[in-house]
Amino acid sequence: MPAFFCLPMACQRQVDSIDRSQSNLQAIPSDIFRFRKLEDLNLTMNNIKELDHRLFSLRHLRILDVSDNELAVLPAEIGNLTQLIELNLNRNSIAKLPDTMQNCKLLTTLNLSSNPFTRLPETICECSSITILSLNETSLTLLPSNIGSLTNLRVLEARDNLLRTIPLSIVELRKLEELDLGQNELEALPAEIGKLTSLREFYVDINSLTSLPDSISGCRMLDQLDVSENQIIRLPENLGRMPNLTDLNISINEIIELPSSFGELKRLQMLKADRNSLHNLTSEIGKCQSLTELYLGQNFLTDLPDTIGDLRQLTTLNVDCNNLSDIPDTIGNCKSLTVLSLRQNILTELPMTIGKCENLTVLDVASNKLPHLPFTVKVLYKLQALWLSENQTQSILKLSETRDDRKGIKVVTCYLLPQVDAIDGEGRSGSAQHNTDRGAFLGGPKVHFHDQADTTFEENKEAEIHLGNFERHNTPHPKTPKHKKGSIDGHMLPHEIDQPRQLSLVSNHRTSTSSFGESSNSINRDLADIRAQNGVREATLSPEREERMATSLSSLSNLAAGTQNMHTIRIQKDDTGKLGLSFAGGTSNDPAPNSNGDSGLFVTKVTPGSAAYRCGLREGDKLIRANDVNMINASQDNAMEAIKKRETVELVVLRRSPSPVSRTSEPSLNGSSHQLNHFDAGSPDSTMFVTSSTPVYAS
């Protein structure tokens, strides 16, 4: 009989794993301490405030998870658990590690993330068996100087801290495969970073780097490199010597050009180079035969190289917000292309070869100067979205055939064509031969049209060659790609008539995640209040009503007159370094909208709630002086340079009443008038002000 009673107790002593996670525990249950041979204890997601000293008598414990509790102290007795191989202290309130941690010689995984550490003891590096060390979201200002002693380290995560420098010994981590230093305050990387020959993933985004060490090419195993949101001007010339690189993110920097060795990146699949200062795209890009996604938005590109057509595996090409006047004919060789976004350029025509992109599902050419579209768009059977305007309510439009009298060829058009600012019969390619070549493509052997009669797509439904249904509705604009960085803006914004290239004054200074959320909510509330006060309507009007209201608004704008007053405005940049204004015009650009031909610089946007708004700057103000620099005959570049010099910006402006480009004094009348929702305060990229509709789907 006693044997039957002893059996359960014997079984209990053999228990080696206990899971009491999410049990609303205030303390470690006493019954746990009876299991002397316990090896795995999971107490995550409870309300435990301290670790009972009896816990440290469980000498066989190998895995201890006390993450997501309310621990403030890690007792020195932790050093008694000499068999420990995994310790998870994530999401607690521990501010200091005891030196006795060095006794845990078998420790392989240590997670200290989301604790208020300001420093780690040097003795932690005596645990040379550690392979994974997580230090994300602490308050670390320094890593241990002897971190190179962790010779078995494979993963080091130190994202979202206050690190300004990296110990030189880090280059001794020859087995390191993943290094995440993103969202810190780093100004430089160790010159010998290339010694990390096993490194596969390197994230150093959202820092203050101005360059990358040349030695980085020594990381020949690297396949993921993210240096986005820094202040990098040039990339190392030998960047192409990383043969395994597949994903490269250099977004939001000040990069002028890509290195000549770029074509050596034969395995590169994704390149994000948006929001830089690129004026030219190297022809070497065509040698990156594995490239599937290419993001070049918000640069200063005036053309694309012909070698773009060599990218046969390219599925996504985004060149929004540049200065492109034409697209090379070779684009037709990109047979895998599914998304082509050319929004907000100065395109006057698309090549006939666009019809050879047989897999194209989204074509975005809004905010250009296109008088019509090439007839070959009729053979894009898979097209689900054709964007021609910011005010467009349907993804696919009814297109009809017409003729280009200048070239004598058939083209297609719709009620949104010609686009605003389209110049009848004149393009900006500047090459007669170029135009001749494109015209000669008509009737060529690679694209054939069954019906040459002037019919609408709707009437063509019974044609022998089915041209697809161009009446599909509610096709969504493509979602943001799965890669890290988000889009610039998710709003459908109104298009400006006669809109020149706009400049936005944005500092490179970045906010923390917490402060950004607060500012986002504040901006959203301000926008909502202002919309309510001014009666701004966001409903989409019919094309006929838009045309009538546009005429009325044009007449009203011509009546703008009255007294002119000089104002001196001092603007203190906010915590993020932003002013919250945009301007247009200047000596080297077209006149600002509604400026009556005045070549001066005019404020075209003041973000509600911004520093500029609070200091009294208003849309329509003409810049006279900026920080003691004369703006009468200045260019936009001159203004930018003058304004960026100081934290406190002093502007002398000339204000006419009523304001010549006022947008907030009257309710929104039509699709071409300006609304107040110019940017999405909840977007990861809401620091960039956008002055026209940009439903961007690239990440």
UniProtKB/Swiss-Prot annotation:
<dbReference type="GO" id="GO:0007163">
    <property type="term" value="P:establishment or maintenance of cell polarity"/>
</dbReference>
<dbReference type="InterPro" id="IPR050614">
    <property type="entry name" value="Synaptic_Scaffolding_LAP-MAGUK"/>
</dbReference>
<dbReference type="GO" id="GO:0009792">
    <property type="term" value="P:embryo development ending in birth or egg hatching"/>
</dbReference>
<dbReference type="InterPro" id="IPR055414">
    <property type="entry name" value="LRR_R13L4/SHOC2-like"/>
</dbReference>
<dbReference type="GO" id="GO:0015031">
    <property type="term" value="P:protein transport"/>
</dbReference>
<feature type="repeat" description="LRR 2">
    <location>
        <begin position="60"/>
        <end position="81"/>
    </location>
</feature>
<feature type="repeat" description="LRR 13">
    <location>
        <begin position="313"/>
        <end position="334"/>
    </location>
</feature>
<feature type="repeat" description="LRR 11">
    <location>
        <begin position="267"/>
        <end position="288"/>
    </location>
</feature>
<feature type="repeat" description="LRR 4">
    <location>
        <begin position="106"/>
        <end position="127"/>
    </location>
</feature>
<feature type="repeat" description="LRR 15">
    <location>
        <begin position="359"/>
        <end position="380"/>
    </location>
</feature>
<dbReference type="GO" id="GO:0007043">
    <property type="term" value="P:cell-cell junction assembly"/>
</dbReference>
<dbReference type="InterPro" id="IPR032675">
    <property type="entry name" value="LRR_dom_sf"/>
</dbReference>
<dbReference type="Pfam" id="PF23598">
    <property type="entry name" value="LRR_14"/>
</dbReference>
<dbReference type="GO" id="GO:0048557">
    <property type="term" value="P:embryonic digestive tract morphogenesis"/>
</dbReference>
<keyword id="KW-0433">Leucine-rich repeat</keyword>
<dbReference type="GO" id="GO:0045199">
    <property type="term" value="P:maintenance of epithelial cell apical/basal polarity"/>
</dbReference>
<dbReference type="GO" id="GO:0045108">
    <property type="term" value="P:regulation of intermediate filament polymerization or depolymerization"/>
</dbReference>
<feature type="repeat" description="LRR 14">
    <location>
        <begin position="336"/>
        <end position="357"/>
    </location>
</feature>
<feature type="repeat" description="LRR 8">
    <location>
        <begin position="198"/>
        <end position="219"/>
    </location>
</feature>
<feature type="repeat" description="LRR 12">
    <location>
        <begin position="290"/>
        <end position="311"/>
    </location>
</feature>
<feature type="repeat" description="LRR 1">
    <location>
        <begin position="37"/>
        <end position="59"/>
    </location>
</feature>
<comment type="function">
    <text>Critical role in assembling adherens junctions; adapter protein involved in polarizing protein trafficking in epithelial cells. Necessary to maintain, not establish, the entire terminal web (organelle-depleted, intermediate filament-rich layer of cytoplasm that underlies the apical microvilli of polarized epithelial cells) or brush border assembly at the apical surface gut cells. Required for correct localization of ifb-2 intermediate filaments in the terminal web. Required for dlg-1 and hmr-1 lateral localization.</text>
</comment>
<feature type="repeat" description="LRR 9">
    <location>
        <begin position="221"/>
        <end position="242"/>
    </location>
</feature>
<dbReference type="GO" id="GO:0031346">
    <property type="term" value="P:positive regulation of cell projection organization"/>
</dbReference>
<feature type="repeat" description="LRR 6">
    <location>
        <begin position="152"/>
        <end position="174"/>
    </location>
</feature>
<comment type="similarity">
    <text>Belongs to the LAP (LRR and PDZ) protein family.</text>
</comment>
<keyword id="KW-0130">Cell adhesion</keyword>
<protein>
    <recommendedName>
        <fullName>Protein Scribble homolog let-413</fullName>
    </recommendedName>
</protein>
<feature type="repeat" description="LRR 16">
    <location>
        <begin position="382"/>
        <end position="403"/>
    </location>
</feature>
<dbReference type="Pfam" id="PF13855">
    <property type="entry name" value="LRR_8"/>
</dbReference>
<feature type="compositionally biased region" description="Polar residues">
    <location>
        <begin position="684"/>
        <end position="699"/>
    </location>
</feature>
<feature type="domain" description="PDZ">
    <location>
        <begin position="584"/>
        <end position="665"/>
    </location>
</feature>
<dbReference type="Pfam" id="PF00595">
    <property type="entry name" value="PDZ"/>
</dbReference>
<feature type="repeat" description="LRR 3">
    <location>
        <begin position="83"/>
        <end position="104"/>
    </location>
</feature>
<feature type="repeat" description="LRR 7">
    <location>
        <begin position="175"/>
        <end position="196"/>
    </location>
</feature>
<dbReference type="InterPro" id="IPR001478">
    <property type="entry name" value="PDZ"/>
</dbReference>
<dbReference type="GO" id="GO:0043297">
    <property type="term" value="P:apical junction assembly"/>
</dbReference>
<dbReference type="GO" id="GO:0007155">
    <property type="term" value="P:cell adhesion"/>
</dbReference>
<dbReference type="GO" id="GO:0016323">
    <property type="term" value="C:basolateral plasma membrane"/>
</dbReference>
<feature type="repeat" description="LRR 5">
    <location>
        <begin position="129"/>
        <end position="150"/>
    </location>
</feature>
<feature type="compositionally biased region" description="Polar residues">
    <location>
        <begin position="659"/>
        <end position="676"/>
    </location>
</feature>
<dbReference type="InterPro" id="IPR003591">
    <property type="entry name" value="Leu-rich_rpt_typical-subtyp"/>
</dbReference>
